[in-house]
Amino acid sequence: MLITSLRAFGVDVVLFFEVHQPYRLRPDLHRVFPSLPSFEEMFYGELDSAIFSRVAERVYRKSTKILLEAAREVGLKATFSVSGLALEQLRRHAPDVLDLFRELASRGFEFAAQTYFHSLAWFVDGEEFREQVEMQAGAVEELVGYRPRVAENTEFIYNNDVACFLRSMGFSTVVTEGVDWVLGWRSPNYVYKAWGCDARVLVRNYRLSDDIGFRFGARWWDQWPLTADKYASWLESTPGDVVLIAVDYETFGEHHWPESGIHEFLRWLPREVARRPRLRFATASEAAEGHQPRDVYDVPPWATVSWADERDLSAWLGNELQRDAFALLKWLYPYARAVGGDALRLWRLLSTSDHLYYQAIKLGPAGEVHSYFSPYGSAYKAHDIYMNALAALTALIREVWSREYAERLELDDERCFYAEGVRLCSLRELRSADGGFKRRHRDDLRRWLVDVFLLDERDADAALSRQP
C-alpha cells in the first residue's frame, strides 16, 4: 500500500547547522616534559581564543542575527547541533551569542543532541557515549529550556546500532548522511526508519548541502555564482517529502568569508523559499514526525557511515597513524574512568574527533579540507603532538594511581582474565572467584594484577588472598 505524507503537497526544507570548536593541542607540548603539563600548558588557549573570537564575530553573531531577521519576517525555522565544547567557549568568549540562540529557540528553532566532546566515544564504550550525549543534552536543556528530541552522533557517524542506542535514550529522530550505496535507487528526500527499532532517520542531501558548504565560492564551478533564487529553484524542483541541508555553521562567514557573498545568500534564501508555495521550512523533528517513513535505512555496524570524505570512517581512522593513536586512547579509557576528575576530563578532551582528523593523510579535495582545518601543517606533526598528549595523560594516571582506583577499574574484554571458562574483569569479580581456581592460576593472576591493575606485588598478593 502506498504510504502518503501527513504533510502532503509540499516539501519540508530542513536547515541543519553544526556548531563546534575544539580545544587544540599546543604544538610545543613536548617542551614541558618530564614535568607533568597543566591544562593550560597542554592546550593552545591563545590560538583557540583568537579563532573563536574571529568566528564569533563573522559567523555566530552576524549569521544568527540574519536568521533571526528571517524568522521574524518569513517564519524561518532550522535546527542547530552545538557541541558542549562550543557551548563552553561561547560562555567564556561570547555569552551574547547564547542569548541569540535562546531567541532562536523562542521562535521555533530546534536544538539537537550530540556528543558533548564531539568525540569518537561510540567506538570506545557505550556508557561513555551515553554520558557524553546526556551531558550535551543537559547543556542544551539548560540553554533553551527543553530536552532535544533529535540526535546525531559526531560527524553524522551512523549505523543501525547507533540509531537504536539513541532511540533507547529517548530520541525519536536520528540524523545522518544520505550515502549512495545505502540508498541505492532511493532518494535521500524522504523519512526513513532505522533497522531494528522505531527511530526515524533523516538523511542529508549531500549534493545540495555541498553546493553551499564546499562549492559556493568555487569559481571553477559551472553554477557559480550561486544565488538564493537559483538555489531555491533547485529546492523547488527536488522531488520528495523532505530536503535536509546540513552544513557547518562556520560555512557562513569563516569557511566562506563575508566577501564571498555568503551572508547575502543566507539573508535572501529564506525569502526565496517563502515565496515558493511548494516549499516550507521545518525543524528536523517536525519533518521526521510529519511524514511516514518510506523504507528502512539499513547500515550494519561493519559498514558505518559518516558525512566526511568518502562517507566512511577514514577521516579519523583511515591510516596507521590514526589507528595507533586511537588504540592508545581506547586503552587508556578504563584507567581514566577509574580515576575520574581531571584524568577523565583530559581523556574526554583527547577523544574529540578533530585530533584524529588532523592526522589524516589524503590527496585531492579531501586532503585540502583536512589541511584547511589543521593548525599543524602536517599529519605527522599532528600525530606526534597527540601522542605527547596521550603520554601526559598516562603520566597523570600513573602519578595518582592507588589501590582505590584499582578497585574501581572495570576492564574491557581484551584485558579480562580468562581460564577454565571463567572470565574476570575487576577486583570484585576476582574476590568472588573460587579459591581453588585462584590457587591454580596464582602466578598468572598475580602478573595480571601487576600489569593490568597497576598494583605492586604486595597489593597483588593481598588481592589474591582477599575474600568477598
Stretch-by-stretch model annotation:
Residues 128-157, 165, 233-246:
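CE4/NodB-like, metal-dependent polysaccharide N-deacetylase domain
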Residues 122-124, 182-190, 211-213:
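Short, charged, surface-exposed secondary-structure boundary motifs
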Residues 12-17, 22-125, 149-152, 172-177, ...:
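Short, well-structured secondary-structure segments
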Residues 427-441, 447:
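Acidic, low-complexity, intrinsically disordered interaction modules
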Residues 64-68, 98-102, 130-140, 163, ...:
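Generic structural signal for well-ordered alpha-helices
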Residues 18-22, 83-85, 114-119, 153-163, ...:
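An acidic- and aromatic-residue-enriched active-site/binding cleft used to recognize and process polar
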Residues 3-58, 189-199, 203, 218-220, ...:
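Active-site and substrate-binding clefts of carbohydrate-active enzymes
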Residues 96-113, 134, 146, 167-203:
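Acidic, His- and aromatic-enriched active-site or binding-groove loops in soluble protein domains
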